[in-house]
């Protein structure tokens, strides 16, 4: 009988096959089974191999037909199969990780080259912060100047508004004075018209009185003439007393003198009254004329001043409009400059923040790559130890032919112990390998998320 062991996984004893010496193995002929005798075969079996005519009876120990109780749990065998599958998956993953590590090492070398190249360059070329600070300082200086100019323009505007208010008050006063003067002028014109009418009436009365005086003179003269004619033509016989002498001519002369005195007095009184009225009207007319002339001159002066004030008001209004337009333009320009500076500052801050984030991301990637590299180095060292142990185990003989049942059982037990030892080693090494693999999977999942 010969015992052949099959090593599965880490040289674990999975089955034991017992075949007769004379019977051929599966897939071989009977003559192929008779080769160099090994230790443990009897002389009878040896002669049977060489003599085809006599085949000795094979005696089998019944104890060998009893299944060998190796005290192996099926769960342990299932666990070993599972470990074998995991080992295959880990080997595949290890191969992919090696490729990724090589790619990452190339990328790391490229990044280190770029980093050293960037560090070797002149920092002033890429140092845009100083330029941005200078530009921001200039913008702030311009903003400060615009604010000062705005304050000055506002002060000038207040002064101009005060002057405009003062001119408006003066203009309103002049308008009120002009209205008063116009009203006074109208009143004076009415008085002048009334005085002219009154003067005309007085002149008419004077003329009527003069004509009346002339008429009275004429009447008196005519009456005197008539009376003289009557006295001359009438012959009167008067018995006179010689004792009483009457002087009629003296009486007539006296009456005539009285009439003449009355007429002269009436004429003088009328002339004096007319003269006084004329002088009074002339004085009043001269007074009214002088006041009218002064009013006209004042009105002309007021018109000139009003025209000047209007022109000044128009110029002040145009100046105010120009100042308001300048203020509005300055405000718009200042607002645009401020918004532009604000936008550029925000862009610079965003660019700086993005650069910081990129730098932090590169540092994190570099750190993660270093961690992955360290983990892969540990994993490679672990796999190297496992491979070296496996190679050392595979260099030792894998099958032994025993001559006795007791020695074969001991050999099988020793082999089972040897197979358990690498299994325990594998179990002990399973933890860090799986942990490192999980770390690698976690890193590559993070890398795929970052790339997306």
From Swiss-Prot:
SMART domains: Filament. Residues 228-251 are annotated as: Linker 12. Residues 412-434 are annotated as: Disordered. Residues 252-390 are annotated as: Coil 2. Residues 82-118 are annotated as: Coil 1A. Residues 136-227 are annotated as: Coil 1B. The record marks 334 as: Stutter. Residues 391-452 are annotated as: Tail. GO terms for molecular function: structural constituent of skin epidermis. Residues 83-394 form the IF rod domain. Residues 119-135 are annotated as: Linker 1. InterPro entries: IF_rod_dom (IPR039008), Keratin_II (IPR003054). GO terms for cellular component: cytoplasm; cytosol; intermediate filament; intermediate filament cytoskeleton; keratin filament. There are two types of cytoskeletal and microfibrillar keratin, I (acidic) and II (neutral to basic) (40-55 and 56-70 kDa, respectively). This is Keratin, type II cytoskeletal 80. It comes from Homo sapiens (Human).
């Amino acid at each position: 009988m010969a015992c052949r062991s099959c090593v599965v996984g880490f040289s674990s004893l999975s089955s034991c096959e017992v075949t007769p010496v004379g019977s051929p193995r599966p897939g071989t002929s009977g003559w192929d089974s008779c080769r160099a005798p090994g230790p443990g075969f009897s002389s009878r079996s040896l002669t049977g191999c060489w003599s085809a005519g006599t085949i000795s009876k094979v005696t089998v120990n019944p104890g060998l037909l009893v299944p060998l109780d190796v005290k192996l749990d099926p769960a342990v065998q299932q666990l070993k199969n599972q470990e074998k599958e995991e080992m295959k998956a880990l080997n595949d993953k290890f191969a992919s990780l090696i490729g990724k590590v090589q790619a990452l090492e190339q990328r790391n070398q490229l990044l280190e080259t770029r980093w050293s190249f960037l560090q070797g360059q002149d920092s002033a070329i890429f140092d845009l912060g100083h330029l941005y600070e200078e530009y921001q300082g200039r913008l702030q200086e311009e903003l400060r100047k615009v604010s000062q100019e705005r304050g000055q323009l506002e002060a000038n505007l207040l002064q101009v508004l005060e002057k405009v208010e003062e001119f408006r008050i003066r203009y309103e006063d002049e308008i009120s004075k002009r209205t008063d003067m116009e009203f006074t002028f109208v009143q004076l014109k009415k008085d002048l018209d009334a005085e002219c009418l009154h003067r005309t009436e007085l002149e008419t009365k004077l003329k009527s009185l003069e004509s009346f005086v002339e008429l009275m003179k004429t009447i008196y003269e005519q009456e005197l003439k008539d009376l003289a004619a009557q006295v001359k033509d009438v012959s009167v016989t008067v018995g006179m007393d010689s004792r009483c002498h009457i002087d009629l001519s003296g009486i007539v002369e006296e009456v005539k003198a009285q009439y003449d005195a009355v007429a002269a007095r009436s004429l003088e009184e009328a002339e004096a009254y007319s003269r006084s009225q004329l002088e009074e009207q002339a004085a009043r007319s001269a007074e009214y004329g002088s006041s009218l002339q002064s009013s006209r001159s004042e009105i002309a002066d007021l018109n000139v001043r009003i025209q000047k004030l209007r022109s000044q008001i128009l110029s002040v209004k145009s100046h105010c409009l120009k100042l308001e337009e300048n203020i509005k333009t300055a405000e718009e320009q200042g607002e645009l400059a401020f918004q532009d500076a604000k936008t550029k500052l925000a862009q610079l801050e965003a660019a700086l923040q993005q650069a910081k984030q990129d730098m932090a991301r590169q540092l994190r990637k570099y750190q993660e790559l270093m961690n992955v590299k360290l983990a892969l180095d540990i994993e490679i060292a672990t796999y190297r130890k496992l491979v070296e142990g496996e190679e050392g185990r595979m260099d030792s003989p894998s099958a032994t032919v025993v001559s006795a049942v007791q020695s074969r059982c001991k050999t099988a037990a020793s082999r089972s112990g040897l197979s358990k030892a690498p299994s325990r080693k594998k179990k002990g090494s399973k933890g860090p390998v799986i942990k490192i693999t999980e770390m690698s999977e976690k890193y590559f999942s993070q890398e795929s998320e970052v790339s997306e």
